[in-house]
């Protein structure tokens, strides 16, 4: 199982997202659990990022919402950002 850490920015983005759309909490929780069990599950559309976000990865929570993360080891990741496609990929 994948071990998760969260960057402070991720936590504030998550809180902001849940405050605006409380119904997303359950969906996010389910996708994170799925990711922890099998990051390669095709339902996640997990993929490496390029250009300025090279060495980072992302998976889909909904059609628009992504979780951006980085691998810290073979079975450890740090969540960096969560939000709409335009928000998490703007950096």
Predicted regions and their residues:
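Conserved N-terminal entry element of GNAT/NAT acetyltransferase domains
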Residues: 1-7
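Enriched for short, Lys/Arg-rich terminal
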Residues: 3, 12-26, 59-66, 70-91
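Residues that form or immediately flank small-molecule/cofactor binding pockets and catalytic motifs
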Residues: 9, 54, 84
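PIN-domain endoribonuclease scaffold, especially VapC-family toxins
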Residues: 25-33
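A generic structural signal for short beta-strands and their flanking turns/coil linkers
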Residues: 31, 45, 55, 63-65, ...
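A short, surface-exposed loop/turn module that caps and links secondary-structure elements
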Residues: 34-59
């Amino acid at each position: 199982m994948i071990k998760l850490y969260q960057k402070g920015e991720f936590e504030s983005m998550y809180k902001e997202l849940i405050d605006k759309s409380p119904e997303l909490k359950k969906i996010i929780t389910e996708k994170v659990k799925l990711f922890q069990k099998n990051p390669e599950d095709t339902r996640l559309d997990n993929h490496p990022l390029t250009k300025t976000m090279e060495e980072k990865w992302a998976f889909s929570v909904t059609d628009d919402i992504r979780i951006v993360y980085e691998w810290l080891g073979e079975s450890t990741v740090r969540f960096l950002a969560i939000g709409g496609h335009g928000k998490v990929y703007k950096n």
